[in-house]
A protein has these predicted regions:
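Membrane-interfacial amphipathic helices and adjacent loop/beta segments
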Residues: 1-4
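Active-site-adjacent pocket-lining segments in enzyme domains
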Residues: 6-57, 61-167
Length: 167
């Protein structure tokens, strides 16, 4: 189930899937990325994307999974996560993080959760679909870096660190 309550019906389990069977892999938004982040089956599956022509798209906190799989080592990206995560997870490269609603680079599309329209448009266009610029009324506001930078308050950060210890 996605963070917005969408249910996703898989057609294969990861053990039976190869990333090469797909033109595109989309990672939906997740409120709590920790279970997926520490699921080696997911990370191993994602690692298969490296050096392929498979489009990979991740929104909200899901780019964390791409980072752990090493797919963002030399790629600019964005994500809807708290900046303290950059200090906690060594696989997130601060120099590659961009404060933008959507970032596309090297067949990887990442977005902050509220930019779901732009995310959908970018995925469709990358797959060769003819999509009008006003498809689903994309965001027209320019956001400042400050508006796109998220921090936990001290108590929420401590709660996250405590939860992280369980992994």
């Amino acid at each position: 189930e996605s963070e917005d309550g969408f249910f996703i019906m898989p057609t294969k389990i990861l053990n039976d899937a190869s990333v090469l069977d797909y033109k595109c892999v989309i990672l939906p938004g997740i409120i709590n990325p920790l279970p997926a982040l520490y699921d080696e089956k997911i990370i191993t599956f994602l690692k298969q994307v490296k050096n392929t022509n498979v489009l990979i798209a991740a929104i909200s906190a899901a780019p964390l999974l791409l980072a752990k799989a090493g797919l963002l080592d030399d790629v600019k990206f964005t994500a809807g996560f708290f900046m303290q995560m950059i200090d906690v997870f060594p696989f997130i490269h601060r120099e590659n993080f961009v404060h933008q609603p959507l970032v596309e680079e090297k067949r990887i599309i990442t977005a902050i959760g509220f930019a779901f329209r732009e995310f959908a448009m970018a995925v469709l266009k990358s797959l060769g679909y003819d999509v009008e610029d006003k498809f689903m009324w994309p965001i027209e506001k320019a956001y400042s870096e400050k508006e796109l930078t998220f921090y936990w308050n001290d108590s929420d950060y401590q709660e996250f660190l405590k939860e992280l210890e369980e992994y």
